[in-house]
Structure formats: C-alpha cells, structure tokens
UniProtKB/Swiss-Prot annotation:
It comes from Homo sapiens. This is Ras and Rab interactor-like protein. Interacts with RAB5A, RAB22A and MUSK. Gene3D superfamilies: VPS9 domain. SUPFAM superfamilies: SH2 domain, VPS9 domain. Residues 532-542 have a biased composition (Basic residues).
Amino acid sequence: MAQPEDKAPEVPTEGVRLVPPQVNKADRTPLGVLSTLEPLTRLQRTWGVWHVPELDTQDAEALVGLWPLGSFLVTGRDPSQALVLRSGPLPGEVNTYQIQKIPRGVSLESSNLCMPDLPHLLAFLSASRDVLPRTLLLPPPTLGPRDEHTDPVQIGRVQQDTPGKVLSIVNQLYLETHRGWGREQTPQETEPEAAQRHDPAPRNPAPHGVSWVKGPLSPEVDHPGPALASLLEEEEEDLEGKEEGREDDPEEEGPEDVLTIHVQSLVRARSSYVARQYRSLRVRIASDSGGPHGSGDPATELLQDVRHLLTDLQDHLAKDSYIRAVFGSRGPGLPKKDEDPGPALETAVCQAVLAPLKPALWTRLRTLRAPELRRLRRRQTALRAGAGPPGAQGPGPEGQSPAPALRSRIHERLAHLHAACAPRRKVALLLEVCRDVYAGLARGENQDPLGADAFLPALTEELIWSPDIGDTQLDVEFLMELLDPDELRGEAGYYLTTWFGALHHIAHYQPETDRAPRGLSSEARASLHQWHRRRTLHRKDHPRAQANLPFKEPWAEETVTGTSDN
C-alpha cells in the first residue's frame, strides 16, 4: 500500500489545469502541503545548489544516479529547464521531466498542476509526487541556522553531519551570490542582498560541487571534486599577492578572501553601515575642507580620518556573526596568534574599502604635499650630482655600495611597498628593504657585523638613488598614521623612525655648502617624540584626544639660513 506522503492527488479532467489561488501576504498558498514555509524557504536558500543551468541533462543524470532516492537537479535556463530525479534504487533509474513555462506559472510536462514559480512547484513535489514516481528529497538547510551543538560550517569544504549521516558541501560561489540568506545581519545590510534571491544563474560557469549526499558514494565510481576554496581563489584576484609575486598556501589565504568578498558585498549594499562609511570616505578624500581631528596639516588630517574610519569599520565587522562563523570555520588547533581575526579583518577592509579609493587618496596626498615633494626631489638630485655615478661613494666598507642586483631588488621592493594597500603588508615590505640594506653592508668575507650607525647612511644612499622617493615619503607618512599602535612599539616603529631620519637628511641637504645635517635637529626629534606619544599612548578617558596633536613632517622644518628653493 502506498505511503501517505507518496499518495498521488486526484487528477483533474483532461485539459483542465489545477491552479492554486494567489499567494497571500504571508507568502503561503492554501494548498495543505504548503501550509508551512520550511520547504519553500529551504529551496530558496539553496537555489544555487539544486539549480545548475550550465549542466547538461546527461551529466546531471550521471550525478543524480550516485545520490539517494528522491535526489534531484534542475538544469538549463528558462524556458528550457528540466527536472532530473533519482526515481529508483537500481542503477540507471533516473528520470528527466521537462518544466513548462505557461502564463499562469510553471508545471511539469504531462501534469495538470500549475504553481506560481519553480520553488513553489518543487516544494509541492517534495510533499506530493503528482506525476512523479516518488516525492523529491530536498537538500539540507546547510546555510540556515545551525544547532548549537553542531560544528561550524566548513566554508568551501566537505562536511559530515554524523548524527544525520549526511555528507554536504557548502557552495562558496553560492555564498557569494546569495550572501543575505543564511547569515544573521542587520536589516539595512540584508535588504539589498535579498534582491538577488531570484537570480539563480551563477556569475561564472564553474565545476559544480555535489550539494548533498546521504550514505556512501558508489564504490565503482571515482568521484573527485574540485575544492571550492580554490575556485574562489581563481575568481577573486589577490592584489597584494600579485604585488609581492609570491604563492602562499591557499588554505591560509582562504578566510581573508572570504572576508574580503563579504565586505565587498556590504559595500555594494547601499543601505548598509559599511556602504555609508565607504561613501563618507570617498567624499572626505575629494573634499578640500579639513577633518574633525584638526592637527593643522591637511595631509595628516586626511590620513587620521582614514585611520579612524578603517578602525571603526573593523570594530563594527568584528561583531558580524557571518565573519565570526567564517573565521571559526578554520577549525581547532590554530596557533594562539592566529585566533585573533584582526589581521585578516584588516586585510579584508583595506582590500574592499581602501583599495578602490587608493588612487584618489594618493592623488590627493600628492596634491597636498606637492611643494614639499618637489623640494625633496631637488635635494635628491643635488645629492646624486655630488656623489657621482651610483655606487661610487657608498656608505659600506671601503666606500662600496650594494651590488647592482641587490640595489635593483631594493627598488623593486620599494615599488611593491607603494603598490600595497594594507598597512601590515607595507610594513612587511619595508622590513624586507631593511634586510636588503643590511645584506649590502655585509658583502665582504670575515667582516664584523655592522649596526644601526652604519645602517642609517646606507639607507640614506639607497633612498638617494631611489627612482620614486616621493612615493616612498608618502608611504612612510601613511604608515606613521595608519599602523596599529602595538606595531609601532616594536620593530616596525623603530625602523619607521629610521626611515624618517633618512628622509630628513635628504630633505635638509644644503647644496650650497655640500653638507647634510649630521643628525636630527631638536625640532625633528621633538616632532618624532610627539608623534610616537600620540600614536602609542592609550587613554581610555579620551580615546580620540591623541589624534588632535599635530605632527611636523620631515620637510616641515625650514633648513639652515641661506638655503633657498627658488
């Protein structure tokens, strides 16, 4: 005897099509099988899983044949769509049904039942088989709310639900396209994303992972599946990775890529807090008026505003449940330093928010610093003329400069440093340049190690022969304002002040007397001390008071009387 759930309804007379009444305000149809929204909601949330428009019918039948009874896929695009169903336990028991588009909705071929749209039709067929040999088996709500005892969803990886004996794959491309569905977000952030709900076509045709599998796979079939994390990495360009020219472990970069995509989606959602802050930053960069942190210097004020906005966004996004879930998907056993999502979140915010505005930001900084940068380049040209050919009077032992190959590598790193966006990435490249400078000082055999006294003049010479000293100056200023205060207390802060000193020597070179300053002036030292205090002193009672202290740049101090720039 047929089970109640498999019992077919009475078929209307030939030529008459059963059409349910209009959907009411609660999005429910009067049909008893759709008295609950759970099947319909599950189908809507997993649309990108069961609908694979680029898959042909033959391949779909081969895939569905490996899955449990009732498993299905929808292939093709409107109006040439087909339902592929695993209808029996024997190999090859897979049926294909054409989906017809009619004025009142959609229906299966040879069926007299019409539903408003495809999800409603599939939801009905999951409860009543109509003309099908059996009801549909819906995919699990992988992207919906999870039981509090389950493990975090493994983004882009195979995950097994032991109690339910379900093997599933979270579709990364689906997450990107339908970001607003299974994650809890603020109302203003989910509203624009919901508009994408009924656009089932993925942006790029890509190998489609198995959506759900109950029980073991057929032992006769070798079923390797591409890692969805790798598909995502091929689709999303890692700008900083291209700048560095290195290949990192994709597993390590995965969470940063996913976070970046999520933040980018929030930037596109115009009513979200992230989008509003992004627009505010764009307006601030283009504005001639000063910011709220009036230090007196327009360029410094602009960078302070950028820092406060990025910090505010990171604090806001750190509370995002989706971001916590993505970072938690990396699993247990991580080193203690990797448990903090701060570095990955900083990279994501810089890539999604700061990188699109970076050309405008640097154009604005060059405009604000134009007179000082011209003077710096004139001093650089004068120093080059006095030094002769590159390497003729280097600071190394016996007047030797770094080898040409090493100097070329230093210049390449300086270019990468300027192209980088995130402060941590810039600092990493700056420290690489420092290591190269030290390597140039220790070229000779049996040579005693050289310390900071030799490093400063060596770095100064490299900057003298740098093709883009103006960009390097702005990079140093950028880092001095945007780098995390904890970083400034360590190695990064020490070398930043050293670069400040080297640029100070070049900016205050006196071509008339052919003499560079022997050390930092008292004004420059006081300015450095004030900057360090402002950036590293935490005051809980006045968290923003430190931003109001002015900071004089290396060029702000006038040179010795008698020096003229005209």
